[in-house]
Amino acid sequence: MAKRNIRIMGDSILNKTSKVIEEVTPKIDTLIDDMLDTMYDAGGVGLAAPQVGVLKRLVVIDVSLEGNEPIILINPEIISTDGEQTGDEGCLSLPGKAGIVTRPNYVKVKAYDRHMKPFEVEGEGLLARAFCHEIDHLDGILYVEKVNGEVHEVTSYDEEEEE
């Protein structure tokens, strides 16, 4: 397992559509582990394969406080949504920035696990937002295309405490 470089907005790979994964090869298995390492190291709650330069329909998400409940989604599809939430959204591919985005408050996704077994998973709040955000990446869509208003600078809690 290893950390991979996160592609930054402006890299053309982030605007391309990812390809379906037909089988989990050893290379894909390693990619899953590397993406988890990369996401946790960067302090993110989700990461899509294009963000590490791979045009495959693969997403990893973990919104748990402890960072120990990873959700691996291969070929994910949103099958239902409900409600609405509006809030700040950021992205590891656009560090130090955030913007107000409206997303569904409830999302149900069908996908395959790392053994290519189909499953469904649902989430509300932050998890629903993460599902939408990461699946958008697989279709070459960045959250900045959905921002209400302007993208703004994000100050970390550490910087605020020093002031």
From Swiss-Prot:
Record: active site: 134
Metal-binding listed as a keyword: yes
E.C. number(s) listed in UniProt: 3.5.1.88
GO biological process: co-translational protein modification; translation
Keywords for the protein's UniProt record, in alphabetical order: Hydrolase, Iron, Metal-binding, Protein biosynthesis
Gene3D superfamilies assigned: Peptide deformylase
UniProt catalytic activity: N-terminal N-formyl-L-methionyl-[peptide] + H2O = N-terminal L-methionyl-[peptide] + formate
Cofactor: Fe(2+)
Binding-site positions, Fe cation: 91, 133, 137
Note describing how the cofactor binds: Binds 1 Fe(2+) ion.
InterPro entries for the chain: Peptide_deformylase, Peptide_deformylase_sf
GO terms, molecular function: metal ion binding; peptide deformylase activity
HAMAP family: Pep_deformylase (MF_00163)
NCBIfam families for this protein: pept_deformyl, PRK00150.1-3
Function recorded in the entry: Removes the formyl group from the N-terminal Met of newly synthesized proteins. Requires at least a dipeptide for an efficient rate of reaction. N-terminal L-methionine is a prerequisite for activity but the enzyme has broad specificity at other positions.
Family: Belongs to the polypeptide deformylase family.
This protein's name: Peptide deformylase
Organism encoding this protein: Lachnoclostridium phytofermentans (strain ATCC 700394 / DSM 18823 / ISDg)
Gene name in the database record: def
